[in-house]
């Protein structure tokens, strides 16, 4: 029975991911017209932000299932496969739907945007496909204990999940809402994020072998950046920390081992 405890956490992760999918699918875009012209004022539906909250909650539970598995010495092959299946939904499908909705909003801002073909929105799901490929490769590779090959899907999922929260709450330093509702920026995010997941770039895992500065300098720098960014930038801290993670991993390049 003890060995099933981590699997319960994994299923909670999946459950939260499913709820995120439901909220992301229920969003409605409200467009405001001034006369006959579509105004630049529009809102990011509250339910899209709720989807983001559930993705972040799923990430917390995803961390806990691994922690509990190690604590109870209850790791199993079934748990490994179940974890990947859950992650595809929580950090692949749900964030892809968020991208789909943001693309829809970006087109609605344009003249004749309501006539946009769904084909322009479907590239959002390339992220889910890339994430599934990334997880399948990870399950077959035993060399990624203290380093990753390619960006882990939870990191990519949280990066995307931060977008609605940034748009809804903003920050006092910089307004990035025009970028996050620009179709070309979103397409670039889809391409770059998908490539980062399926690539074999050596990226650091956030595990501490010990607490020496020599062996953990990039991780300690990342922690400092994360704390400062969270204090100063609120939800914009998420993409900032994500980018810092990539840069630090490449600067302190280390092969997964």
Regions found by a protein language model. Name each.
Residues 9-12, 51-55, 123-130, 156, ...:
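Hydrophobic alpha-helical transmembrane segments of polytopic
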Residues 42-46, 53, 71-135:
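Multi-pass membrane catalytic core of lipid/isoprenoid biosynthesis enzymes
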Residues 36-47, 111-120, 148, 175-185:
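Interfacial loop-to-helix junctions that mark the boundaries of transmembrane helices
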Residues 18-26, 92-102, 159-167:
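Membrane-interfacial alpha-helical segments at the cytosolic side of multi-pass membrane proteins
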Residues 1-14, 48, 69-88, 135-155, ...:
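Interhelical loop and helix-boundary elements at the membrane-water interface
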Residues 18-21, 57, 61, 95, ...:
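Alpha-helical transmembrane segments of polytopic integral membrane proteins
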Residues 145-257:
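C-terminal membrane-associated helical module and adjoining short loops/tails
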Residues 1-63, 241, 252:
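Topogenic membrane-insertion module of multi-pass membrane proteins
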